[in-house]
Amino acid sequence: MLDAVLKRTIDPPLDAAAKRLVAFNIKADAITVAAFVLGLAAIAAIAWGYYLPAVVLLALNRLLDGLDGAVTRATGAGPRAVVAATLGTVVLTGIPFGFALADPSRAIAAAFLICALAGASAARISTAVRNGADFVESGVAFVAFAFACLLPDRFSLVAYVLGVLAFVAAGARLAAAVRPT
């Protein structure tokens, strides 16, 4: 639900920015790689306990993640979403790993969340490829991770709640995928 609202709000300015970037011959793949690098930097910042810079890096990662899709739409460059989704999943599952590195007492909660996010990402990718859907599903995860960065002592609670939501989302996608059409 949150992602649908965010998409309606953020797509028009992203599409406008994408047209400008396309005019300068900026490719979606370059934006995807930049988003990935920012995501890796956010993971490192979390691991070192720099939570506020991590929130900024995550926000920039999410912004570029949306922008690479907008550039792809503007250029009609075809389905580049698998590369973006794969790199996005590495960042998404790396964030809980960063929290575990920052404080090993969070390792079990981080492992639970990594498993849940990996399952949800796999289900999302497989059903999106089959149905031609896009890969916008990260608004809730961003809010949860930003909250965890602002209140790192609450990471385990955030991890368990987000993990349950991710498992439910994966189950719902799998149920929809096997339902006769």
Tell me the role of every PLM-derived stretch.
Residues 30-78, 110-117, 155-167:
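Membrane-embedded alpha-helical segments that form the functional core of polytopic membrane enzymes
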Residues 2-17, 83-181:
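A feature for the membrane-embedded catalytic helix bundles of lipid/isoprenoid biosynthetic enzymes
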Residues 1-3, 53-54:
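A short, structure-level motif marking secondary-structure boundaries and short turns
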Residues 5, 25-29:
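N-terminal membrane topogenic signal
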Residues 13-23, 48, 71-80, 128-130:
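Short juxtamembrane and helix-loop transition motifs at transmembrane-helix boundaries
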Residues 25, 45-49, 102, 150-151:
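Helix-loop junctions at the membrane-solvent interface of multi-pass transporters
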